[in-house]
UniProtKB/Swiss-Prot annotation:
Chain positions found as Phosphoserine: S372
Extracellular side, ranges: 43-78, 245-264
Residue intervals annotated with topology Cytoplasmic: 1-21, 100-223, 286-440
GO biological process annotation, one example: cell-cell signaling
Biased composition annotated in UniProt, kind: Low complexity: 136-149, 388-401
Gene from which the chain derives: Gjc2
An MF annotation (GO) of this entry: gap junction channel activity
Pfam families named in the record: Connexin
PANTHER family xref list: CONNEXIN (PTHR11984), GAP JUNCTION GAMMA-2 PROTEIN (PTHR11984:SF52)
Protein name listed in UniProt: Gap junction gamma-2 protein
Free-text tissue specificity from the UniProt record: Mainly expressed by oligodendrocytes in the central nervous system (at protein level).
Organism listed in the record: Mus musculus (Mouse)
Amino acid sequence: MTNMSWSFLTRLLEEIHNHSTFVGKVWLTVLVVFRIVLTAVGGESIYSDEQSKFTCNTRQPGCDNVCYDAFAPLSHVRFWVFQIVVISTPSVMYLGYAVHRLARASEQERRRALRRRPGTRRLPRAQLPPPPPGWPDTTDLGEAEPILALEEDEDEEPGAPEGPGEDTEEERAEDVAAKGGGGDGKTVVTPGPAGQHDGRRRIQREGLMRVYVAQLVVRAAFEVAFLVGQYLLYGFEVPPFFACSRQPCPHVVDCFVSRPTEKTVFLLVMYVVSCLCLLLNLCEMAHLGLGSAQDAVRGRRGASAAGPGPTPRPPPCAFPAAAAGLACPPDYSLVVRAAERARAHDQNLANLALQALRDGAAVAAVSADRDSPPCAGLNATSRGAPRVGGLASGTGSATSGGTVGEQSRPGAQEQLATKPRAGSEKGSTGSRDGKATVWI
């Protein structure tokens, strides 16, 4: 076998080792050591002379070949090689599916990371869906804002990873446990439940559990089929001689087998290896079933112990829809740009501040009118009369101006007490001259 073939086989075994449980790794070790190596090294040397040393007590040409065909319809070594190939086929197919799925997942994660990266990309107007009846047109929403992030929920399973570079401590522990150690060649033992699942939770997180169980079932079925076929072909013992009566043998002849005891021991060893592989398959299926059941029980206990969760967040259309006078259809949420919502909030604050200033000014004016003393010398009727601006005569204006000036000086009440008659006469004189006069 060339170096390229050995390197390909090594990479293949490493990939199978990385995507299997602990019991699966033991099965792989048994397959490589006790089947491939034992068949290639021991079986080839033991069964190398199985036909050349198979002799019959006759000289009839062709009798030896016919009798050997009756003794071993299929060579032991070739039967075991075919068994190894068929039993390894489900694992190889599972590995191909796992590599393909992980490659697609990594490509999707890379694209999702590029979408999550901040940028200045804008959504084209042509790709926007038409608004429902009664909703504002999307073209009137103003200039498009830069897209900072896009959230995608597609192709995400219950245990899937959140994003690139966001592996939890449990996932990092699983990766270290799957690799089998650190860079210095020492085995890293991860304490806690993260280091005890032996790849089972990693297979669940990658979404490969169903395919893994299916290949286990197919592999176990192949093991049972080859065990039955080996028993029907060879039994449990290689006999030292074989009686043959086929044509062209002239009569019943005795044929003798080379090293029958050694071949019997090797045949029994291969039976044991096949039974061990079948047992490992059954143990692995039981391990997966019990582990999944334990995880389900722990999840229920954790959910019951956690109690009620946090208060759910209100839908995003509660405030913007009420402010804009819109109503959200069923199962829909109204999304409003952050800039428009901020501008609306600032406008509301400005309106509230202006209204507060107006209310304060009105209250101050009312309180000032209530606290000011009434003008002395004027009766209630003249104080309550409405004032007409711009129509008072010069005499009336002077009189009113003098009255206001006198109110501001001390002793104004005594001076006003001596002037009401003169003021009345002046007002009468002004009315005689035909000028409009207003009594204040």
